[in-house]
């Protein structure tokens, strides 16, 4: 278990839960917590506290996580993904119904389908809540976080080409979520699977492609394959993107009219006739459009978030700041775009 889900060992987080407010979250485990001589929660957050003294992750902590005796789930562990040297031991992509346009299971299966076609072994874990899933890819040796993220983004972009409904928000749910740790920061964390309490409800377990849990979870984990860095380099050389997140509309002030370049779209990707309705927005019918076309159309109204990249460049926290701002909205039968996209859409359809 520890050889697969390997994050930082000098610090880890535990879940907390407030019965009064019903809120929950994770915070690093500190040996000085509630010690009045050192701990001042009103003044400092745990990660920024000058008196912090984090507890090392030990087998006893993992055992309690797996046992799951705490009725409020406060024995659940979160591990910090990015190691010293900005490396990581795995890639984890989070899918849930909040971010997915149509059922997280569809997005998971499209992502897994890309992994299979690229010969990348991956594992599906149903989330603690049961309303989402994590897809894990494990590395044979620590890999640069920036390279792990490139792999995750390449798989996601191909998944979007195969099914245009896969949300652009998925780029924000790739862990590690940073290429480099912010100065003095701990980076993002991922909750460990096989949480004892959730497991009793059939959640936080590994499942097959029908989302049926494997009967022997430990036997499954013993046979999980890891990928090597040379193989990942081959995958990125073959499938890597000139643009990390695929083609998006530019945010350049000098050429704000430029649209993303259509990628390998042919007449076979379109029906004979495409219905467009101009109302409060521009509505383009989804009937007969291929996944590649839908993916391209939504990218016409999407661009990189300058706030995110400004903070990332200064090594500041980018928590809760999306990488991409998208003004496209995928409905049941149409994709809706701002009316200013009309000329570009018409040019694509001509």
What are these regions (language model features)?
Residues 2-7, 191-194, 298-299:
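Short, hydrophobic/amphipathic alpha-helical patches that form generic packing surfaces
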Residues 2-131, 138-150, 154, 161:
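Signature for HUH/AEP ssDNA processing cores
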Residues 5, 34, 194-198, 210-211, ...:
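A broadly conserved detector of short glycine/acidic/proline-rich loop/turn motifs that flank catalytic sites
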Residues 11-18, 164-173, 233-237, 248, ...:
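Short glycine-rich, low-complexity/disordered patches
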Residues 17-21, 83-85, 182-185, 199, ...:
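Short, ordered beta-strand-loop transition motifs
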Residues 76-105, 140-256:
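DNA replication initiation modules
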Residues 116, 121-122, 126, 237-270:
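Long, charged low-complexity interaction segments
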Residues 256-349:
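N-terminal accessory nucleic-acid engagement/regulatory domains that precede
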């Amino acid at each position: 278990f520890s050889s697969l889900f390997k994050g930082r060992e000098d610090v880890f987080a535990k879940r907390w839960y407030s019965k009064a407010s019903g809120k929950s979250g994770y915070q690093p485990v500190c040996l000085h917590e509630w010690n009045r001589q050192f701990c001042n929660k009103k003044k400092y957050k745990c990660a920024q506290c000058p008196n912090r003294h984090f507890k090392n992750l030990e087998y006893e902590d993992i055992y309690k996580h797996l046992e799951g005796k705490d009725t409020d789930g406060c024995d659940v562990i979160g591990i910090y993904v990015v190691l010293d040297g900005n490396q990581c031991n795995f890639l984890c992509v989070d899918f849930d119904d909040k971010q997915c346009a149509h059922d997280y299971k569809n997005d998971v299966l499209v992502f897994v389908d890309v992994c299979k076609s690229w010969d990348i072994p991956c594992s599906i874990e149903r989330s603690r809540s049961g309303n989402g899933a994590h897809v894990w890819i494990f590395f044979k040796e620590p890999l640069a976080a920036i390279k792990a993220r490139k792999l995750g983004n390449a798989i996601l972009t191909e998944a979007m080409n195969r099914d245009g409904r896969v949300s652009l928000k998925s780029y924000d749910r790739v862990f590690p979520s940073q290429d480099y740790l912010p100065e003095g920061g701990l980076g993002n964390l991922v909750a460990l699977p096989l949480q004892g309490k959730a497991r009793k409800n059939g959640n936080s377990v590994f499942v097959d492609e029908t989302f049926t849990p494997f009967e022997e979870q430990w036997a499954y984990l013993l046979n999980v394959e890891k990928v090597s860095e040379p193989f990942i380099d081959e995958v990125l050389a073959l499938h890597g993107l000139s643009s990390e997140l695929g083609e998006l509309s530019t945010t350049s002030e000098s050429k704000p009219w430029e649209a993303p370049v259509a990628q390998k779209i042919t007449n076979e990707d379109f029906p004979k006739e495409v219905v467009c309705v101009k109302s409060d927005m521009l509505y383009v019918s989804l009937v007969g459009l291929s996944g590649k076309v839908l993916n391209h159309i939504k990218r016409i109204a999407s661009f990189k978030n300058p706030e995110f990249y400004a903070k990332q460049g200064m090594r500041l926290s980018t928590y809760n700041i999306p990488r991409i701002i998208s003004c496209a909205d995928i409905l049941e039968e149409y994709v809706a775009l701002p009316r200013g996209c009309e000329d570009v859409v018409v040019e694509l359809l001509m």
